Amino acid sequence: MREEVQNYYGQQLHSSDDLQTNACCDQEPPAYLKPLLAQLHDEVVMRYYGCGLVAPQLLKGMRILDLGSGSGRDVYLLSALVGEHGEVVGVDMTDEQLEVARRHQDYHRDTFGYVKSNVRFLKGYIEELDKLDLEDSYFDIIISNCVINLSTDKPKVLRDVKRLLKPGGEFYFSDVYADRRVPDNLRNDPVLYGECLAGALYWNDFLNLAKQSGFADPRLVESRRLTIENPDIEARLGRQRFYSATYRLFNIDGLEPACEDYGQAVVYKGTVDQHPHAFSLDDHHVIETGKVFPVCGNTWLMLEKSRFAEHFTFIGNFDTHYGIFEGCGLNVPFEDNDAGNDGAPCC
């Protein structure tokens, strides 16, 4: 299937208008990102096929790896956010996409006013990151945008992500997931695979895979149900539903399989740039500035052992266990709004 994907994204697709479904539609970006997105080269934006926004908080000076970087849209957006002294590396297997990305490297360096470009692009497979010149425990953040579903060896990808992340780093990525396991007759369809549907993991299989790969507590940031909007493909899919979802997986030792209550709390100082009033860790943890916010042990560690630590006051310790943290459940996690993309633009 790898060759079919290379052909689909290298030869058949020339812009997002060529896609046959709406799987590659972004959420509306926050206001502070819109001026940066407007500065990106038109060709880079036109050849972008992501399904979410992969720009987490607090990126200045960070080292970031983008898996399946394509035309470089996310790489160049993050290039502006990390600043001249940060670094962004893109990995992609498609020559045509890499050519677009590299062709506009000087353009973005000059646009952002940098003396030297802070990005580089490597040709390679995301299942074979060990064959690239990438140092273990080097990256603060690894991102991916609607690419993991295309991989033929997802466990290997997650193992390599774990290896390449610094302690306290995170894998912050958007992808497509299914509400049930995709049957073989759909999984082997090249068009459905290229459209990011056939290779999508059943959501609970993904959670189990993440935990088996060393990411004990995957956190869902945002999600939306995909409305395929292609009658022929909808008829073939039947009752199968797909979702675009953004997860963050922290590379932190000591995270537990469930949310445990140790009587802890945090107070957000309001000091993360662009987030003066509240800090959003995930879709269940929006922490208002100055308010004592009770947290489970895992949330405590995600904040205290990551780049966010200096922006919080931490109350309590792990001395006494009070049982499971209230509200820790295993229901279908995604938003199931039939409104689709809520008017967000396709890209």
Where are these regions (language model features)?
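C-terminal lobe and adjacent flexible extensions of AdoMet/dcAdoMet transferase-like proteins
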Residues: S213, R219-R224, N230-C347
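Class I SAM-dependent methyltransferase SAM/SAH-binding core
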Residues: L59, R63-L67, V75-L129
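A short acidic, Gly/Pro-enriched loop at the edge of an enzyme's catalytic core
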Residues: D130-I141
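Short, glycine-/aromatic-enriched active-site segment of Class I SAM-dependent methyltransferases
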Residues: Y177-L197
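A short glycine-rich, Lys/Arg-flanked "PGG" loop and its adjoining helix->strand segment in the class I
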Residues: P155-E170
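Conserved alpha-helix/loop element of class I SAM-dependent methyltransferases that forms part
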Residues: D26-R63, L77, L81
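Short alpha-helix
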Residues: G199-G214
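A short SAM/SAH-binding and catalytic strip from SAM-dependent methyltransferases
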Residues: D140-D153
